[in-house]
Amino acid sequence: MSVSVHENRKSRASSGSINIYLFHKSSYADSVLTHLNLLRQQRLFTDVLLHAGNRTFPCHRAVLAACSRYFEAMFSGGLKESQDSEVNFDNSIHPEVLELLLDYAYSSRVIINEENAESLLEAGDMLEFQDIRDACAEFLEKNLHPTNCLGMLLLSDAHQCTKLYELSWRMCLSNFQTIRKNEDFLQLPQDMVVQLLSSEELETEDERLVYESAMNWISYDLKKRYCYLPELLQTVRLALLPAIYLMENVAMEELITKQRKSKEIVEEAIRCKLKILQNDGVVTSLCARPRKTGHALFLLGGQTFMCDKLYLVDQKAKEIIPKADIPSPRKEFSACAIGCKVYITGGRGSENGVSKDVWVYDTLHEEWSKAAPMLVARFGHGSAELKHCLYVVGGHTAATGCLPASPSVSLKQVEQYDPTTNKWTMVAPLREGVSNAAVVSAKLKLFAFGGTSVSHDKLPKVQCYDQCENRWTVPATCPQPWRYTAAAVLGNQIFIMGGDTEFSACSAYKFNSETYQWTKVGDVTAKRMSCHAVASGNKLYVVGGYFGIQRCKTLDCYDPTLDVWNSITTVPYSLIPTAFVSTWKHLPS
Amino acid sequence: MSVSVHETRKSRSSTGSMNISVFHKASHPDCVLAHLNTLRKHCMFTDVTLWAGDRAFPCHRAVLAASSRYFEAMFSHGLRESRDDTVNFQDNLHPEVLELLLDFAYSSRIVINEENAESLLEAGDMLQFHDVRDAAAEFLEKNLSPSNCLGMMVLSDAHQCRRLYEFSCRMSLVHFETVRQSEDFNSLSRDTLLDLISRDELETEDERVVFEAILQWVKHDLEQRKVHLPLLLRNVRLALLPSDCLKKAVSGEALLMADECTKLIIDEAFRCKTKILLNDGVVTSPFARPRKAGHTLLILGGQTFMCDKIYQVDHKAKEIIPKADLPSPRKEFSASAIGCKVYVTGGRGSENGVSKDVWVYDTVHEEWSKAAPMLIARFGHGSAELENCLYVVGGHTSLAGIFPASPSVSLKQVEKYDPGDNKWTMVAPMRDGVSNAAVVSAKLKLFVFGGTSIHRDMVSKVQCFDPSDNRWTIKAECPQPWRYTAAAVLGSQIFIMGGDTEYTAASAYRFDCETNQWTRIGDMTAKRMSCHAVASGNKLYVVGGYFGTQRCKTLDCYDPTSDTWNCITSVPYSLIPTAFVSTWKHLPA
């Protein structure tokens, strides 16, 4: 076929209609790559030798450059290697690993196993085979466990594997007692140790373990690490240590006594500890703030809906243990925790009178006291802690209340209690008065979900209070009209479940308090109206409630990472829970 | 990551359970190919330059070798080009075409249009890009037309595109009268021309068209081509030329008389023609064999089921014209054609007596004569021509027959008539006696489909007679039990349609007599029991039949290439077809 013949065909064809056919052979690229691999195996047209260890791999520059930016840059720049016909990795890459990478480059397939996954991830990142690096990270994610999670944390941090890093980090927090004994722990960089030990989510009930881990890390390389001691000491919740341990072991530690700043930190912690022991006001110092697993869960309830007793949930033994009687039994009250104290507000007593009373139970000293009464007598209201103050929201009142209100109509009034001054103050009222709403605080704001409105309907609104502006807004609508629901907070996520709704009473949702977005989560295991929920550690706990004539008999736990509910224990037959709170936990002094 | 670290990981992992993941990135080959294309466009890592015309194309040897065996061989095995860094196609390849091929090699995609398809086919074949060659062939198949089919035939023959060759050859045959006038015709090779003119399927009713075409071809390059004249003439159906045309050839065409071989051929053809004109025995010379388009379709029928007239189908005018009366009207007879004669055998006359008579109608001389009577009087039998002899198969007889047989029971007997000596001979009987069966000959064998058995059931067997063995075998089962069906033959394919069957009487099937395989084809436009079919040209024709009380009023045509049925014409109201034959056609002498 000559050039002139083709020109004739062009001129002839042009007189006809335009007829075009795009031919694409989807298997063509696979075929070319397979052929290139055969050429490589036969050492045909290869123009570069890669050396690793004592092995040599002949390759095609163009193919390597097409697969990896590392090689493209190496061969195309003014670098020495761009001219050389050999590249030597010496001992920085194992020949078995390089072989796997090259097999992948020429076949698009690679076998990843426990022996090679970490090395492949490193080499894949180094040579910019990002697909390999990501595939190995995924493999390691599926094979993550407490004995290797610390190593994976270091590996993923070094190679920008975000998801593997997140999963490893979470597993390290959950398995602190295991990883602290790991040799890798002692080799962690300083910033990572600080981040780990200071985390709220670090799962330990014995703060002594955290102190000892910090001291071990310092001692491992005392010469270089001694200067970091003050920073590490601040990660330990020193005021939560047993008093004797704090006085004798920590205060007397030679490494601490010889360093002025560390000594000051310990002395501050001792003063804080004494304040706790003497019950002298509210202790809000960071060194006394328990980690999430240091929370104690308390149920309030009784044999009827009249609440007369306080119970402790023993998570280890999976038991519910009576702790104290309530001085003044009541129903339709609200309960909230600040620090290690439980505040019980309002409700109705044995003669159905609406109460202004506020009782306070000190979980540390196991004793009751009375706080200043509320400004408005309430029942069916909600309450939450915000910046160490107690807020009481909505509910019903009676004609005898101090402020004017219609009998049995949902209140708009919101009042604030400051424990340090033992005083109540009115703050901005709700946009819409509600009772039987779910009230929580998250990210320095109060949220009220649903409830019963002044016209006795179920309200489908989310109402939000900003303390800085002293103002309520309505930033979102609930997925459905709601009342008698339960809510609890994990980070910026508010979980709402159960309740009286047009949909199933076992449905549960997640609300992002920053984006105001709703997400459905897994259903509660039973239908629960008037149930109660708290968050502790990285989990949610729900108890109580009923549906029809059936009482819900279990205490259930929800794990957000798995989106599953499990039963923790059975509620005693004689107990009807009417409130559920989480307080700071302290070890016996 | 060092070698020792990897070794440590291997030994550590081995203690655990074996856990393997095969990572496969399906898009990796496409990514690599796209990157290679980018490298090519930037002239990076290129190690060979292809030249075509005045354009240069830098490429990667490895990629070209992986894409094409032509380049793999060129660059390997010590050839000169294996060391040169340039390859020059000069004017053998148009640069636009080479560019398209290289784009395909590096992207798996190519745009094919009317301007480039032929050149791509040629270059794709030359450089062994067979996918491109095949894709271009497919494009050309879809754009085949009478004005280009001859050129495509030449092109596809040169480049082993078998399917395009078949399609273009078929189109050239169907449109011979058009293609012989094209410029390409004179450029055909001798073998290609022979292939065309030797085929029965060449569609012309006037053999002078073929005769003049080959003279034209020879004269186009007289010195080189006159040596081929004898062979070409042997493939023209010279005896079908009008007598005056033959005489003119003898006296007027100097070219034909100049060569002794050619003269002999003309003389032989003339003697054959004379024999036909004098009606001196059966003429079976290839010179007298009509092309399929030269067949005459004849319908036998009458105003009732008693047949008393022969009609001719005029294709051009789409009419059915009476031609002659039958000397002895009859029903339940059978009719077959040998050459230009129609043989009417057996049946029952006006007094229901079963007949042995054989009447012969000569379509050239338009006259009846009587042949020797059959050995057995029959009705409801089948007949077919095989190797210029007439075979009569099965049917019913009566006690008056020469051979013993039960009254009205289906016959096994088969007898053969040789027109050469005007004698009947018994041949091997069928395995199962049948009547009302479809009987045809194909590939030198007789085939009998279904029929009524001696138990009066419908038969579902295909029985086959091989005259060289004088033996019947059962080749296959019919798709369903059958009788009163029609059958016709195209090449090795036997088409069977209609009839009395458990399924629809409109169904039609194709049987491959070489592989014994059945295939369902498109249904007829009407249900037809006792219909009749013939093949002519590349098409099937069916006429007659009834369903319930409804007569089928049309003559329909089936085109196997499009698997569709169409109506040709209506059968006159006064005509009930009872037989349908196809004879050789001769022009008026």
Curated annotation (Swiss-Prot), chain B:
Residues 149-250 form the BACK domain. Pfam families: BACK, Beta-prop_ATRN-LZTR1, BTB. InterPro entries: BACK, Beta-prop_ATRN-MKLN-like, BTB-kelch_protein, BTB/POZ_dom, Kelch-typ_b-propeller, Kelch_1, KLHL25_BTB_POZ_dom, SKP1/BTB/POZ_sf. One of its GO terms (cellular component) is Cul3-RING ubiquitin ligase complex. The keyword Repeat applies. Kelch repeats lie at residues 296-340, 341-388, 389-444, 446-492, 493-538, 539-585. Pathway: Protein modification; protein ubiquitination. The keyword Ribonucleoprotein does not apply. Residues 46-114 form the BTB domain. Gene3D superfamilies: 1.25.40.420, Kelch-type beta propeller, Potassium Channel Kv1.1, Chain A. SMART domains: BACK, BTB, Kelch. Keywords: Kelch repeat, Repeat, Translation regulation, Ubl conjugation pathway. GO terms for molecular function: ubiquitin-like ligase-substrate adaptor activity. It comes from the Eukaryota. Substrate-specific adapter of a BCR (BTB-CUL3-RBX1) E3 ubiquitin ligase complex involved in various processes, such as translation homeostasis and lipid synthesis. The BCR(KLHL25) ubiquitin ligase complex acts by mediating ubiquitination of hypophosphorylated EIF4EBP1 (4E-BP1): ubiquitination and subsequent degradation of hypophosphorylated EIF4EBP1 (4E-BP1) probably serves as a homeostatic mechanism to maintain translation and prevent eIF4E inhibition when eIF4E levels are low. The BCR(KLHL25) complex does not target EIF4EBP1 (4E-BP1) when it is hyperphosphorylated or associated with eIF4E. This is Kelch-like protein 25.
